Amino acid sequence: MLVWLSRVNHCKGFGIQSPTDYSFVRYVINEHWPYYQYEEVGKDDDWLTRKLGLLYFRIANWLQPKVIMSDGYQDYLQEGCKTAMFNDQAETIDLVHLKLNGDYRSRVTNIYNKVNARSVMIIEDIRKDVSFWREVTNDEHTGITYDLFYCGIVMFDRSRHKMNYIINF
């Protein structure tokens, strides 16, 4: 509740001027209508795992990636895009889910070499290393970023103006 109250000014995309970014926040991040697999996928998970999993499901459904690199939540991601393949060794990765454990800094450097303007990276538990999240948002490889408190979403389309949105999720 305290997290929600501290971010109340960032509800439902208020203050976002870009129609594309607003649409992503409103209809992917904060979508409340049930999707076709909501009742089945992750029904036995705890509330936060399920909340994040359903977000990852919606992102995969929206992006329709060909290749996914993931540190977890494969069932949610696969339900979001049935045709996606999980392959950490692919030359190009469309969707990345990264947990901040192990040598995540060097992994991100490698990921930067495998993404394109259409790719999306989800970094889970960004509060674990706030300085790392700031580095990601300021990095020359990244474009639009979304801070959802529990995770961060990174877009790589650098043709657009760089922004970091704080979203009440």
Which functions belong to the PLM regions below?
Residues 120-122:
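Structural detector of well-ordered beta-strand residues that form the stable sheet scaffold
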